[in-house]
């Protein structure tokens, strides 16, 4: 069912790094009643993420980096273990994720497989993330990784079983990473 939505006002509150909108809109309900809503929406662009796995070694490549939003929300160190990811900017998702993989992990991946696209926080964030997996091997290591410019990224090659256990212990708390690790487990690619 399509609901009627009428934009009343879109005020930009900030466009420092990303864009924060204050949006006023009317939503016509199924019964015909029109309800006015006022919401803040954070537009950070769309992104892509990839989980690198090695079925023979039963390992995955993740990264650890400082994430200020987690630090503000009580993650004492601000460090987060996650899959390689980045904003699309003007790139296609596959182009973006290949670039991010080599910058962040040092691996120049071959065939990548797109799994799905998901909104991770649709109540207030516009971002749509494209999810990928790719098998990696040691001979695809082009550099040490670690990111670019102001990034300080640690590359982690972990046994797959340990990564799954780290979800249970709370060491891995990033949503996209949990989704991709669980997908890998359910797909039986590591069996």
Swiss-Prot record:
Alphabetized Gene3D superfamilies for the sequence: Nucleoside Triphosphate Pyrophosphohydrolase
Origin superkingdom: Bacteria
Residues that, per the record, bind Mg(2+) 1: 85, 104
Requisite cofactors: Mg(2+)
Record-level GO cellular component terms: cytosol
Alphabetical UniProt keywords: Hydrolase, Magnesium, Metal-binding
Similarity annotation: Belongs to the Nudix hydrolase family. NudK subfamily.
Record's protein name: GDP-mannose pyrophosphatase
Organism encoding this protein: Shigella flexneri
């Amino acid at each position: 069912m399509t609901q009627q939505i009428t934009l009343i006002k879109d005020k930009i509150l900030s466009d420092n790094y990303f864009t924060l909108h204050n949006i006023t809109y009317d939503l016509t309900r199924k019964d015909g009643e029109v309800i006015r809503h006022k919401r803040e929406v954070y537009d950070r662009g769309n992104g892509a993420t990839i989980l690198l796995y090695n079925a023979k070694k039963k390992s995955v490549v993740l990264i650890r980096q400082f994430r200020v939003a987690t630090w503000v929300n009580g993650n004492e160190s601000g460090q987060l273990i996650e899959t390689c990811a980045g904003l699309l900017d003007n790139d296609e998702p596959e182009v973006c994720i290949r670039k991010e993989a080599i910058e962040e992990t040092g691996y120049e991946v071959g065939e990548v497989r797109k799994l799905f696209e998901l909104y991770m926080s649709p109540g207030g964030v516009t971002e749509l993330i494209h999810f990928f997996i790719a098998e990696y091997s040691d001979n695809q290591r082009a550099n040490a990784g670690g990111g670019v410019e102001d990034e300080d990224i640690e590359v982690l090659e972990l046994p797959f079983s340990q990564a799954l256990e780290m979800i249970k212990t709370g060491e891995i708390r990033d949503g996209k990473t949990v989704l991709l690790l669980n997908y890998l487990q359910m797909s039986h690619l590591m069996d």
